[in-house]
Amino acid sequence: MLSKLVVLALSATSALAVSPLGGGTWRSTNPSFNVQTCEGGHVSGSEFSIPAKPSGSSSGGACSNGHTRAERRYTNDYSSGKHQFGGELRINSFGGDRVSVKQTFNGDDGPFFILGVKKNGDLYSVEGGGKTIASGVARVGATVTVNTVHDASAKKYQVYVNGELKFTQSAPGGSFYDKIGTYTTDSGAGPIDVTWSNVGFWTQ
């Protein structure tokens, strides 16, 4: 009986772990990161929160535009090949609307892809004209698995939600890196508190 319980526990753990998607052989990487906050944003481990309004504090090293921010900036910089991010996003509380939870930056040109969440739980592409990626999956209390696959050589970017391909767009050339956390979009506002868990990075 004990052995069966152990097997079940291990199976449950495996089911919860985020895995790379999209086919092919992926090699796991472990990039470091820098914590970036601005205007009252707070990072505690893997939990990210921003207030309803800017606090007036420009400390945190990431306040060039004055938006509220609580993010990790990963040092996974790349300019060619295939690169994948995966993680589980939980919305702990949300009293605002239209907040970024994941960004892929095109070097000094800024983000070319921003994954945003609306108060109704929709995930959407902020930079892609506000196109809905997945409806209602990221409501308060929900956990959603997100994978992004960027083929920098082919200039293609894809987003998987809960294991299903939901969004594909063309990508520019250049150098890239990823951020996760919370960041107020131009049309959005906090407060919001989220947790990113089981985060992984892979390359081909």
What are these model-derived regions, one by one?
Residues 28-50:
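Extracellular glycan-recognition surfaces and repeat-rich motifs
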Residues 1-17:
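Fungal secretory targeting signals
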